[in-house]
Amino acid sequence: MSVFALVDCENFYASCERIFRPDLKYKPIVVLSSNDGCVIARSKEAKQLGIQMGVPWFKTKKNFLKNGGVFFSSNFALYGDISNRVMNILAGMANNIEIYSVDEAFLDLENMNLENSDVADEFAMHCRSLIKQWVGIPVRIGIAPTKTLTKVASYLAKEQTKRPGIFSISNNWMEIASSLKKVPLHEVWGVGRRLSKKLSVLGLRTAYDLACIDISLIRSRYSVVLERTVRELRGETCLQLDKSLDPKKQIVVSLSLIHISEPTRPY
């Protein structure tokens, strides 16, 4: 049975800046575009202040600084280096890895038994601990039988209090359905706000609503891409990892400040 994990670095650019400024742990942080024109990244605390992505810096600067916020000009060389370190750790923890973006990667965990949630949770906690200890970046991890469901799991991991930052979904439909009911339609991977508005005319509001719709209706009115999304939400694996590149070739090699030995796989 296919099992995937999505590892998502939390508030990545802001978290990178915090590595070198631990005194800013609970401070609002924003990272600005290359010319300091607009906000391109926010810490959780900055989000709580209502700072929006893409807002012109001159419009929010005064209020942000008044609330004790700290801003940084973007440093993409730094972010790329930190990303490389995270991806190197992940490459040693799975059979295959697909680097999806600078702060996200899918892992192939085909040997994991998802029916035992403790196994998935222990792997996720081990992974989070290694990355936090060796690199200093907090990550969120979703584990599920399809890539689309890992996105759902990652979304739900944000709200976890018992085991913060991790969430797993088994191949049991009742468990899948329970998870999907908590996710707004626009949060489904590949749907977004524009398509969710079009789908709302069909009465769809949540990921669960989309998973329950007639496949033939989706195929005739929309696209094969959305059909795959529906099937994946039901637990049917349609999307595999992109293995066009060897994992080691996906990672831009850079000089490391720390020596990374191959992590053990706790499953």
Mark where each language-model region is.
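Residues that scaffold, gate, or flank divalent-cation-dependent active/transport sites
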Residues: M1-V102, F106, L233
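Catalytic palm subdomain of template-directed nucleic-acid polymerases
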Residues: L107-R128, G203
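Generic non-transmembrane alpha-helical segments
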Residues: R85, I89-M93, H126-V135, K198, ...
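Short acidic, glycine/serine/threonine-rich loops at helix termini
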Residues: C16-R18, A41-K44, L149-A157, S223, ...
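Short, conserved phosphate-binding/catalytic loop or strand-edge motifs used
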Residues: V102-D108, P145-T150
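DNA-contacting surface of Y-family translesion DNA polymerases
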Residues: E187, L195-S261, R265
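Long, highly charged, low-complexity intrinsically disordered interaction regions
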Residues: F123-V183
